[in-house]
Amino acid sequence: MIRERREAYRDARLIVIASEGKDTERIYFKALAKEYTNPRVHVHILERSEDERNNSSPEHVLKQLNNYKNQYELEADDELWLVVDKDRWTDAMLSRVATECTQEVSMHMALSNPCFELWLLLHIEDSALLTPEEQKQWMENRRKSKNADPYLKVRLRQKMGSYHESSYDALALIAHVEDAIERARALDKNPADRWPQTLGTRVY
């Protein structure tokens, strides 16, 4: 099959993002792309079909990116980004995904440990100011009860006043994106590792 070309923006570098979350990452990156427009860069966030919405494994997200790559004719400077969480996924699975990413020049993995909410929280809170016990709470990201939200979602709600993974004010966070980048870099003690082994996020 002849691959299609995305003619509408082929003069621009293309950045394609596929994420593990159903809504949280999509809301954030769409707002970010709208706020930081650049005629030489086009950001495309892949949507999931209804059949795919409950399949969030890193392997499935990688498959989604590969399907896109095989369907469209990409240029040498285009980038494909896999945005996933450490959460419950095994090191063996993440290693397989990371290995495949390193075999493709255009493919990159941005993993958050424990989850993407860490990246959001770094916009408005500096993890360097936390006590060791608080840092442990962030990393463990536990629920107080079976039906409660994980710790970082609760923390975001406390800091923002209102937060739900499918509806939140991403622009309020993006106003502090430079702070988030600086804080994420400070957390990344071993940037040569394929993903953060401790509290950290490579979304920066």
Q: Could you describe each region identified by the protein language model?
A:
Residues 1-12, 27-51, 69-81, 85-204:
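C-terminal accessory helical subdomains adjacent to catalytic cores in phosphodiester-
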Residues 14-18:
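Conserved beta-strand elements of the Class I
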Residues 19-20, 84:
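Conserved residues at beta->alpha junctions
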Residues 21-25, 53-62, 198-202:
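Phosphate/oxyanion-binding active-site loops and adjacent basic polyanion-contact surfaces
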Residues 63-68:
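Alpha-helical scaffolding within the catalytic cores
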